[in-house]
Amino acid sequence: MRNPHSAFPQRFKFFPISPFSCRLHEANCWSWWRLGLLGFVFLLAGCNGTFSHYKEVDHSLKAGNPDKAVTLIQEAEDDYGRKNRLLYLMDEGMVLHLAGRYEESNTVLEEAYLLVEELYTTRLRDQASAILINETQLPFEGEPFEHVLINVIMGLNYALLQNWNEALVEARRIDHRLNVLSDRVEGDAYKEDPFARYLTGVLYEIAGDLNNAYVAYRKAETIYDETQSWSKMPLPDGLKTDLMRVADILHLSEDLEEYRTKYPEMVDEVPLPYDADMAQLIVVSYHGRSPKKEDLFIDVPISLDALALVALAKSVGGQSTRSNREGEALIYGIHGQIARVALPRLVPQHTKIAYSTIQLTDGTTTFDARSQRVYDIDAVAEKNLDDEYATLVLRAVARTAMKMAAAEGIGIGARSAVSKNSQDWVGLVAVILARIFVLMTEEADIRSWRTLPGEIHLTRLWIPAGSYNLMVNAVDRQGRVIGQPNTDQLDFRSGEVRLLLRQYLE
């Protein structure tokens, strides 16, 4: 007679009990498979933990050691893994940017940009594993606003290198990305970005392309107004003055008069006619840290005693987290009438800083300005999450329903397999272990670009050519200076434009 084991590939023969021998040795079989399934539960529960290096990265950046942050990210490359390749590139590119290693940053972010383009066209997703386990089994694709910010950071890198031609390439890429979004996205979902449009205008203007700069400024004005309900960003005063200045340079007298009427409070802030011999300092300030995502576990009891058990678990253990879910999964799995759904929620990391003060002095004359908030990443991240929340809820509910049904099916199958020997405990153990597996592997996708700031501020200051001492201070919401002033000595030629970057994590 043909050996039934021969039908199985050689790689399956390491199992002490094969599937074919289950019918002959039910007790031993289910002991082995019970232990194997339990081990698999704990293995998978530990596979999708959060990245622990972020705390050390934040500490290094706050201590003023961005190169250490770069090292920490690079050392964690294997922890990111293949499915999180895009996230790794975004994190590495950002910390290189903060470390002043702008060329290296752009090399990394260019790879991220190309990977996003590939994801846009192929959408390579292992949907089956996501449905059976959780969303973290999918390759990280990033949010639409994060895709836009890849090119924003690259554009800033080139501007910091004073490579204005390449900066314009990034401005055009930003335009293209937002135009594609506008074509694909319907309704009031995120499809435009006010700061990205504003930055393209700044880059066009510095490069001497005033017509495109003016178009970008006008578009940014419209988008700031249209998105204020969710971007939480009023129209920056700097953009108002930019519109007046460029309208005057282009001899658009009607437009200039329109803006003077529209923004009378800014008329005295725009010295006209514009003096092309004036040098310009642009300071981009990063304040705080971007919001992080956490799991929101929703336990759904389907009986009164299950409701009482959930209430008891919450009163003892508090809010469910990834660190305490094992005990709950064990209790709920034994009970059998409690389902769990995991959804992401944003946790803002609000900055203490209200603004920065910028002061330039040549020994006799002092020029000063206050930074203006031009981008609230907390608000934009919240908008992106809100846009996809209905879909996330539907997928999470469907996933939980399928997994719970599969768990019950395992119990039925196990009981059927051993019914001849009346070993009902085998089916009970199997279904309990399957439920525990379902509960422990349910988690939300909380991956995000956490090395971004919480806010971006922009300052533009026009000065005569010469040598200056620079002092930048961070000011909190009570008007108090935080930390030590950031100082530098700068020399400006006639008509020169220089961009500086400052970061404050408080």
Feature names for model-found ranges:
Residues E408, I412-E506:
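C-terminal soluble interaction/assembly domains
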Residues N48-F51:
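Bacterial signal peptide processing site
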Residues L44-G46:
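C-terminal motif of bacterial Sec signal peptides marking the signal peptidase cleavage site
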Residues G81-R85, V116-Q127, V180-A189, E221-S253, ...:
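Boundary/linker segments of alpha-helical solenoid repeat arrays
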